[in-house]
Amino acid sequence: MANKTVLFNKHLEANAKMVDFHGWDMPLNYGSQIEEHHVVRQDAGMFDVSHMTVVDVTGAEACDFLRKLLANDVAKLKVPGKALYGGMLDHNAGVIDDLITYYLSDTHYRIVVNSATREKDLAWITEQVKGYDVTVTERPELAMIAVQGPNAKAKAAAVFTDEQNAAVEGMKPFFGVQSGSLFIATTGYTGEAGYEIIVPEAEAEALWQALLDNGVKPCGLGARDTLRLEAGMNLYGQDMDESVNPLAANMGWTIAWEPEDRDFIGREALAAIKAAGTDKLVGLVMEAKGVLRTGMPVFFTDADGVEQQGAITSGTFSPTLGYSIAMARVPNSVGDVAEVEMRKKRVPVKVIAPSFVRNGKQAF
């Protein structure tokens, strides 16, 4: 039996097309994936992300433990509510998961992990926490709703209490605050402004309905994928996994090499990979007809005249730009043009940094 989120009946009420997503019954779309995509870029849409797992890490050694566990450094987080993104690596520097960590106090951090990696993540964290004065608590009683788009914050404000609106006023990106029963964070997976709201399951249906009543449109996994790809955001299991190091997944910016004496898990292996050189994740743009798809081979000739090959990790038609975009892992020697093999023909593509759309506009 597939797992169902607390909002399952709300999806059925809205005539969602449900699909299995890593063991969860989730909405693919509510009619038109393209319309859902545009509503997030132009107005406000919401996603049920209750399949993701909230984990609270508490105790006297919570900071020390997370500085060991994560490649990014939680010691950088000084202001309560501030969050950072980064990888949890294995000893070979493979990415076990990418996750967001919120600093709530010196003895309380909150991690949000991907649904596809939940069991693996929790097993790894439980193993690594041995010997630390730390308690790891999964919070299955919490649901999560992401409200995203240029009008998302204004429409959410109509639903929040006065206290909650005061709490989020002026909040910068990548912060979270507990106000009343809601944990409201300025994070997302779309490249738009908005909130990810963690809500007790008992209140989730009422919050979803209140957002609906205020003109926020429900959006499914289909639009979520095209939006995150336009924003150049990785999808775990597709753009990276344990066989991929973070430098080859456009996550180099999330690795805190300083201070040198912080021995995070995977550091030694990653330093060796960095010294030897590794592949990189790039963006591809194809203005010709056709759609770039996962797995298609990518070819280019390097500066020495040698043909090199990589592969697309995520590809789609971009509803915002009107042509196809992709992310691809390729040898580091790639220039600004390449070719993709589709239907036994090679088609030219532009190579850019993997970010295509930000705040509704072309980002390259």
UniProtKB/Swiss-Prot annotation:
GO terms for molecular function: aminomethyltransferase activity; transaminase activity. One of its GO terms (biological process) is glycine decarboxylation via glycine cleavage system. Its EC number is 2.1.2.10. It comes from the Bacteria. It is an enzyme of class 2 (transferase). The keyword Transferase applies. Keywords: Aminotransferase, Transferase. Belongs to the GcvT family. The glycine cleavage system is composed of four proteins: P, T, L and H. NCBIfam families: gcvT, PRK00389.1. PANTHER family: AMINOMETHYLTRANSFERASE (PTHR43757), AMINOMETHYLTRANSFERASE, MITOCHONDRIAL (PTHR43757:SF2). This is Aminomethyltransferase. It comes from Shewanella loihica (strain ATCC BAA-1088 / PV-4).
